[in-house]
Amino acid sequence: MKSAEIREAFLRFFEEQGHTRVASSSLIPNNDPTLLFTNAGMNQFKDCFLGAEKRAYTRAVSSQKCVRAGGKHNDLENVGYTARHHTFFEMLGNFSFGDYFKRDAITFAWTFLTSEQWLNLPKEKLWVTVYATDDEAYDIWTKEVGVPAERMVRIGDNKGAPYASDNFWTMGDTGPCGPCTEIFYDHGPDIWGGPPGSPEEDGDRYIEIWNNVFMQFNRTADGVLHPLPAPSVDTGMGLERVSAVLQHVHSNYEIDLFQNLLAAAAKAIGCSNDGQASLKVVADHIRSCGFLIADGVLPSNEGRGYVLRRIIRRACRHGNKLGAKGSFFYQIVAALAAEMGEAFPELKSQQAHIERVLKAEEEQFAKTLEQGLRILEQDLAQLKGDVVPGDVVFKLYDTYGFPMDLTADIARERELTIDEAGFEREMDAQRERARSASAFGMDYNSLVKVDSATEFLGYDTTEGQGKIIALYKDGQSVDQLGEGEQGVVVLDRTPFYAESGGQVGDSGFLQAGAARFDVRDTTKTGGAFLHHGVVASGALLIGSPVEAKVDADVQHATSLNHSATHLLHEALRQVLGEHVQQKGSLVDSQRLRFDFSHFEAVKPEQIKQLEDIVNREIRKNTPVETELTDIETAKAKGAMALFGEKYGDTVRVLSMGGDFSVELCGGIHAKRTGDISLFKIISEGGVASGVRRIEAVTGAAALAYLNAAEEQVKEAAQLVKGNRDNLIDKLSAVLERNRQLEKQLEQLQAKAASAAGDDLSNAAVEVKGAKVLAARLDGQDGKALLALVDQLKNKLGHAVILLGSEHEGKVVLVAGVTKDLSSQLKAGDLMKQAAAAVGGKGGGRPDMAQGGGVDVAALDQALALAVPFAEQGL
């Protein structure tokens, strides 16, 4: 059976047993912040098992895409070198949420594996393990299913603690847990290895193909197991492993799915397909990379993006080992989509996007790969012992973008290991430097502790009445704030919006009788709104009633920019692709800043598309609508939630242009899209690997920006004696004339240098039979000095030459040594001395070198070094 047929058979079998077929969840877990990637079929059902979520079904079946690379489950360095380690795999699973339990779970598994209608595996090839004290499961297997006792193995606490066993599953130190039973396939005596539980169990003869976890207990902090009222079942069977069994091969890389990917990888690289470990690495890694990018991950230097970058770069390096020329990895995506796109349509729909991301990352890595490998080879050549020092590993990571496991991979090929602890120490030191650099002053949001929550009035008004419930000065609670004192005021009710979701906090003032407090910013800690500012007059007392008034003009301008970010977000997804995710924003009254995930610079024509889409929505002048609902209803309506953001039971859904933009947002917004008036992007650039930033203006600020640009056009036209209509032609003519003049200048300088060369050759002094010439030629650039040194070397025939110039406020130096002397005297050595004398650096070949510096006053002193340099070397 082919892998795709096995997958479909599994899903269909359990559907016939009353299970609901559930699609694979994303590789980015949406309900578990402790997980880097989805790594098991049960991840998406975690809340069902915990009783926190009720679904319309109590039986489920799925084929879940999983990634195990980085974090706790990191087998990256083994991938390609063993038969069964992968960064990506499919987990087939059936699940019961308080429905059936051990008897049905065991019967289902056995029927599917051994029945002629399904997989028809020989029963005598199957071994079974149970937890040592799980007599119930043991009896079901032996007395009801009929597995003979000689193929049954009880596994006890083999990990050094109670319930720490290969056959006892726990979610943590406390919580749901229970025994499990595993089914193993015996590949036969030709393969080394022993049955589970034996000293030889790590061999490849007996391979686990199915695991049934029985969530039977709740473990409390005292270690006691309490029976769960509704026990559940979580099972998993690796598709790749069972495919190897059914296709009668002993390595996962020999199954049909991998054979096609290996062939595609060999073709893209231009190498043979002979089972090389490096080719297996590439074939494995295209799966994890393709699926991760399809699920919205982009290469970066942190978190999930960094794991993706590590996998891509490892694949590139192994392709390079096999002789790949240029970018190759992205070319295998088509084969991946053809092989797995039927079961996972996102591979086909996002094929072009995946290819673009991989190609861009390959090209970026290629720039440093060769140089980094050369540095590593130099370090390894000087290595004493068999451990690569941590500082070397860190240098390669920090300077050349080599992930630690890539260096470990290269070291492994030379039977070396790396000093991981030393690398981590270097990383910790770097993090500490970063923390020190980012230290800043007092943070009221962490210092202020307020039990009461503030009622927010600002969605409906910019003015309101409230009462002072807390005052703070220098982070300390006080009873009053006097005139001229800076501090924080907390009210029971306020119309001031507190900084959140990228929107800056409101400003304005609080009036308490004769006392006035100028609010410069508003933030939030817990449920309390903190009004930061200074007492302009009088004194504020706890308990005093106040009139709160927001600066409505500033808030209105800010709200327009905030609404524009929502329109921009959707426009970005339409123009660049659905992989775009918000990575940060800053919205104030002057402009908006929007950070988003993308792998390359946004092209000028794409900028125009973005502006056209946003301005089209503005011109439609549709209402900006809000609705309070629960999170699941909001998501069902297509509302975008920011990844990593925490949402309560009730969320605020903001819709613009009907269903054009639907997001969860608690900010202040325009009433209608037409209020924004105009949208103009003023800059685009990168802020981090895989993260781009757009800055834009709206309304009056956008009009002012365009007016200023118009004035600049007019001024430019006047400078070239033209007008707006012929400005481009005029500028082109000026630039062409400038190019011609520069060419003429170069020719004149060359003639002058040639004439100077004739004169200079006469100024050379003789040192031990060689001519030594040092001269100052102010105004000449490096190019002219190089040409002159070449000319002088020909004239003098047997010489050391050092020329210097003051050019545009800096020192330019060129040194030359004729070939016959370059084995004794090296121009690069002379240049290092001369450049150092003028506060700079330099270097080059033995016969020619360049340098420079900033200390013009020391130029003559630097030139004087030529004669003693020659005297010492000859």
From Swiss-Prot:
GO terms under biological process: alanyl-tRNA aminoacylation; negative regulation of DNA-templated transcription
Keywords on record: Aminoacyl-tRNA synthetase, ATP-binding, Cytoplasm, Ligase, Metal-binding, Nucleotide-binding, Protein biosynthesis, RNA-binding, tRNA-binding, Zinc
Enzyme class: ligase
Cofactor: Zn(2+)
Subcellular location: Cytoplasm
One term under GO cellular component: cytosol
Single GO molecular function: ATP binding
Binding site for Zn(2+): 562, 566, 665, 669
Catalytic activity entry: tRNA(Ala) + L-alanine + ATP = L-alanyl-tRNA(Ala) + AMP + diphosphate
Main location: cytoplasm
Keyword hit for Aminoacyl-tRNA synthetase: yes
Record-listed E.C. numbers: 6.1.1.7
InterPro entries: aa-tRNA-synth_II/BPL/LPL, Ala-tRNA-lgiase_IIc, Ala-tRNA-ligase_IIc_anticod-bd, Ala-tRNA-synth_IIc_core, Ala-tRNA-synth_IIc_N, Ala-tRNA_ligase, Ala_tRNA_ligase_euk/bac, DHHA1_dom
Cofactor details (free text): Binds 1 zinc ion per subunit.
Pfam families assigned: DHHA1, tRNA-synt_2c, tRNA_SAD
Presence of the UniProt keyword Ion transport in the record: no
Family: Belongs to the class-II aminoacyl-tRNA synthetase family.
Domains as described in the record: Consists of three domains; the N-terminal catalytic domain, the editing domain and the C-terminal C-Ala domain. The editing domain removes incorrectly charged amino acids, while the C-Ala domain, along with tRNA(Ala), serves as a bridge to cooperatively bring together the editing and aminoacylation centers thus stimulating deacylation of misacylated tRNAs.
Protein purpose: Catalyzes the attachment of alanine to tRNA(Ala) in a two-step reaction: alanine is first activated by ATP to form Ala-AMP and then transferred to the acceptor end of tRNA(Ala). Also edits incorrectly charged Ser-tRNA(Ala) and Gly-tRNA(Ala) via its editing domain.
Record-linked HAMAP family: Ala_tRNA_synth_B
Name of protein: Alanine--tRNA ligase
Organism field: Pseudomonas putida (strain ATCC 700007 / DSM 6899 / JCM 31910 / BCRC 17059 / LMG 24140 / F1)
Taxonomic classification: Bacteria, Pseudomonadati, Pseudomonadota, Gammaproteobacteria, Pseudomonadales
